[in-house]
């Protein structure tokens, strides 16, 4: 059923609001995907904080007008699904991981930091750890020397505690 003009304006406004907050948009062709598979993809995207939407390309072009993603409009042809995320890598990760298990989803393009990315660049972006993963790695690196020092102190304390009763018995005898 076609959308009337008010519905189209509402869709463009909703997508524009998501685009305004986004760091990355990834575009993929979804021709031939079953409803069940698409539902799984939407569920995964929702868990990862990715706004996933199938919409008319003309509405998507209007939504990205005047944004850093406007250059992506040339890539908006055919049946596409749009992954929009505030995190730089999560939309690329979600769609790339799904494309690995489902050959009917084909990554087409993306946009990050005002630059249009081809499918290979989107896959490369998906291989980068997310912000949360990088923070966890940094904390692990920072915490390792402190925890090693704490284990050393605990081992010394345990060794001294074991040796102290033997010395007390020898002194008392």
Curated annotation (Swiss-Prot):
PANTHER family: 39S RIBOSOMAL PROTEIN L10, MITOCHONDRIAL
Name recorded for this polypeptide: Large ribosomal subunit protein uL10
Assembly, per entry: Part of the ribosomal stalk of the 50S ribosomal subunit. The N-terminus interacts with L11 and the large rRNA to form the base of the stalk. The C-terminus forms an elongated spine to which L12 dimers bind in a sequential fashion forming a multimeric L10(L12)X complex.
Cited function: Forms part of the ribosomal stalk, playing a central role in the interaction of the ribosome with GTP-bound translation factors.
Biological-process GO terms, alphabetical: translation
One GO cellular component, as annotated: large ribosomal subunit
InterPro entries cross-referenced by the UniProt entry: Ribosomal_uL10, Ribosomal_uL10-like_sf, Ribosomal_uL10_bac, Ribosomal_uL10_bac_type, Ribosomal_uL10_CS_bac
Record key words, sorted: Ribonucleoprotein, Ribosomal protein, RNA-binding, rRNA-binding
Source organism of this protein record: Cupriavidus necator (strain ATCC 17699 / DSM 428 / KCTC 22496 / NCIMB 10442 / H16 / Stanier 337) (Ralstonia eutropha)
Pfam families: Ribosomal_L10 (PF00466)
Cleavable signal peptide: none
Annotated Gene3D superfamilies: 3.30.70.1730, 6.10.250.290
Gene Ontology terms for molecular function: large ribosomal subunit rRNA binding; structural constituent of ribosome
Family, as annotated: Belongs to the universal ribosomal protein uL10 family.
């Amino acid at each position: 059923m076609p959308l009337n003009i008010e519905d189209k304006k509402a869709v463009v406004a909703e997508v524009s609001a998501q685009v305004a907050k986004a760091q990355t948009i990834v575009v993929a062709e979804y021709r031939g995907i079953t409803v069940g598979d698409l539902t799984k993809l939407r569920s995964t995207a929702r868990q990862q904080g990715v706004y996933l939407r199938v919409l008319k390309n003309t509405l998507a072009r209007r939504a990205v007008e005047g944004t850093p993603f406007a250059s992506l409009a040339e890539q908006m042809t055919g049946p596409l699904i749009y992954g929009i995320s505030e995190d730089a890598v999560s939309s690329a990760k979600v769609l790339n991981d799904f494309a690995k298990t489902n050959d009917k989803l084909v990554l087409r393009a993306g946009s990050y930091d005002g630059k249009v990315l081809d499918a290979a660049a989107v896959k490369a972006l998906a291989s980068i750890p997310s912000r949360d993963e990088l923070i966890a790695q940094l904390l692990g690196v920072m915490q390792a020397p402190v925890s090693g020092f704490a284990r050393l102190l605990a081992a010394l304390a345990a060794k001294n505690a074991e040796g102290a009763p033997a010395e007390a018995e020898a002194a008392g005898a």
